[in-house]
Design a protein with these regions (language model features):
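GST-like domain detector, emphasizing the conserved glutathione-binding G-site
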Residues: 1-172, 287
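Long, positively charged, glycine-interspersed low-complexity recognition regions
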Residues: 236-288
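Acidic carboxylate-rich catalytic motifs and surrounding loops in phosphoryl-/glycosyl-chemistry enzymes
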Residues: 50-51, 226, 276-280
């Protein structure tokens, strides 16, 4: 198996759809949740490793890249949520295993197919898919982040999972990660609001709901009425990251996102995650 490192090595070089998938993540990171929504919908079994938000010791094998998500796929490292989704889309399409809306009907946003055309080539993105995936990254995820970390109370609410879902971390480590992580994200949210010139946070969030309603244009999904596409999965992942927060509850009563979200829950179904591991040993470094 290929040794992990800072790559990048295209997943397209793999002989087929990878069987051993390990996602290094923060459980509530919107970009990590995009990847998990894709993996769940495609039915690809995967394990997750929770990265400590301060020490990031679980990413010690990645000497240069210290962000999440990082996917190890049959020993090959792939960084960045869009690169992960696009690469796996291409591999699944190549084998004729890609679930989702067909190309041409508001179709699934595909990626390159490793230069190998034919029956298994990934479908080209529709204008709606490409535009909405940019919108998720450049607007929606930022606005959601600013909202859930705008107050220290909601920031602590968001980091509550650390105290219950990272059992292999000691109690002091869990408490420290929650306090420092919540405080750090509170500061980052303030900086993001200034950097991206965002207005009142809830008003921006409701504006995003209205923008989504407009893009949905009466369809069941962004990709059409039959099945969701990758843009749907990305929006769904970002929202699923904040389930249980005040921001999520307010989104569910504003506009048409609730019926779409419920339809997405039904379409995605049960998670294909095999296990969640916190503090497990990272892969051996490649020495490169």
């Amino acid at each position: 198996a290929a040794a992990p490192g800072d790559g990048p090595r295209a997943l397209a070089d793999l002989g087929g759809v990878p069987k051993d998938l390990v996602l290094y993540q923060y459980e509530v990171c919107p970009f990590c949740c995009k990847v998990k929504a894709f993996l769940d919908f495609q039915g690809l079994p995967y394990r997750t490793v929770e990265v400590h938000p301060i020490s990031k010791s679980q990413l010690k094998f990645s000497t240069k890249y210290k962000k999440v998500p990082v996917l190890m796929a049959d020993g090959v490292q792939c960084n960045d949520s869009n690169e992960i989704i696009n690469s796996l889309t291409a591999l699944l399409a190549r084998e004729g295993r890609l679930r989702g809306a067909p190309a041409g009907g508001g179709g699934l946003l595909g990626a390159f197919a490793g230069g190998r055309g034919g029956r298994g080539a990934a479908p080209e993105p529709s204008e709606t898919e490409a535009r909405m995936r940019r919108w998720v990254d450049e607007r929606f995820a930022r606005v959601v982040t600013v909202n859930i970390y705008e107050t220290l109370g909601e920031s602590f609410q968001t980091f509550e999972y650390i105290t219950t879902e990272c059992p292999s971390w000691g109690p002091v480590e869990r408490h420290g990660a929650r306090v420092v992580g919540a405080g750090l994200m509170y500061v980052i949210a303030k900086r993001m609001k200034t950097k991206y010139n965002l207005g009142e946070s809830r008003a921006e969030l409701f504006a995003c709901c209205d923008e989504f309603d407009k893009a949905l244009a009466g369809r069941r999904f962004l990709a059409g009425d039959k099945a969701p596409g990758n843009a749907d999965l990305c929006v769904f992942g970002v929202l699923r990251a904040v389930v249980g927060t005040d921001s999520f509850r307010e989104v569910m009563v504003h506009g048409k996102m609730k019926p779409w979200f419920l339809a997405m829950e039904a379409a995605v179904g049960e998670s294909s995650r095999l296990s969640q591991e916190a503090g497990v040993p990272a892969p051996a470094a490649s020495g490169a």
